[in-house]
């Protein structure tokens, strides 16, 4: 997202400084939901230092182009039906976690088709 350099992510602490990412990253394209990360304390808050184990998920970010066109809730509904975890961001932007058990190729093909029609902008995040 233009002008945004960091974000807060939900995570489950599984050790002193190890966490499982529990939300879909909008900004950080090096992380995905389900990754196990090692964090360091900076200014009283945890910050990701490195990925310890990849969780197997990929992340895509979708921005609907035409307010009169594709409804973000319809896109989210389709992604949910494919088994993705979906979060809504500012301006109707969606971030989706495509799990290892989801049909990633079909999802990518469908989203690429919407992008080719000019209905959405597509920005990949971390791809497993």
Question: Where in the sequence are the language-model features?
Answer:
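Short beta-strand/loop turn elements enriched in aromatics
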Residues: 1-14
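Short, structured beta-strand/loop micro-motifs enriched in basic residues and often containing a Trp
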Residues: 13-23
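Short, Lys/Arg- and Gly-enriched loop/turn segments at beta-strand edges
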Residues: 42-54
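Short glycine-/aliphatic-rich beta-strand segments at the starts of folded cytosolic domains
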Residues: 52-66, 94
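Helix-rich terminal scaffold detector
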Residues: 67-128
């Amino acid at each position: 997202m233009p002008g945004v350099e960091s974000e807060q992510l939900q995570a489950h602490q599984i050790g002193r400084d190890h966490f499982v990412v529990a939300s879909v990253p909008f900004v950080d394209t090096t992380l995905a939901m389900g990754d196990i990360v090692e964090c360091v304390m900076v200014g009283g808050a945890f910050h990701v230092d490195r990925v310890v184990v990849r969780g197997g998920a990929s992340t895509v970010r979708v921005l609907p182009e035409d307010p009169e066109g594709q409804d973000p809730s319809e896109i989210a509904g389709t992604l949910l039906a494919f088994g993705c975890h979906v979060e809504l961001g500012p301006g109707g932007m969606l971030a989706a976690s495509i799990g290892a058990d989801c049909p990633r190729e079909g999802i990518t093909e469908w989203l690429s088709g919407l992008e080719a029609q000019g209905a959405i902008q597509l920005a990949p995040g971390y791809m497993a």
